[in-house]
Amino acid sequence: MRVRDGSWSSRQTRLVDGAVESVQRMTFPAPVVERTKAGARKLGDVYWRELRRSTLGVFRTSTANDEFEIRLLGRGPALLRFSRGEEAVSADTVSCRYPIVGGLLARGPAGSIRFTQQGTDVVAVTSAVEGFLPRLGVIYAPVQSRIHVALGRRYFTRLQREAGR
């Protein structure tokens, strides 16, 4: 398969059980992070920093009880709660996955958000929500999904800047 540098794609799917999947993908001419656990963590860290930056601080992240949380203005109940990031590194892939464990916007502990860089020369980076069960499925597509897609574009731009490309 030939990968074109700079190509962008986005896909949203709603599964039979109501779970949603949203995948944004962009290619780069070279790796944007090292193929190490630190590189895997950086994929996640850049996304969470970009969440706060691009929403002007409306959505803020914090760590509590070995969980990672997103809160509105950093207060009140968690909108989404995640387990600690799980880094994975192989010969041509580096990724960081955050299992969803709850929050006001989740129907329960299901799904994850995963950030992956795959390839060795030209690489594909993905931001993927997998198997997420939104509490309010009717507002997921018009609200949460759009936020994830817009944030995905900003995330890829930030990765590119930080990699100096």
Segments from the language model and where they lie:
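Charge-rich, low-complexity N-terminal segments
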Residues: 1-74
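Amphipathic alpha-helical interaction segments
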Residues: 55-56, 106, 163
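Hydrophobic-ligand binding "helix-grip"
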Residues: 72-120
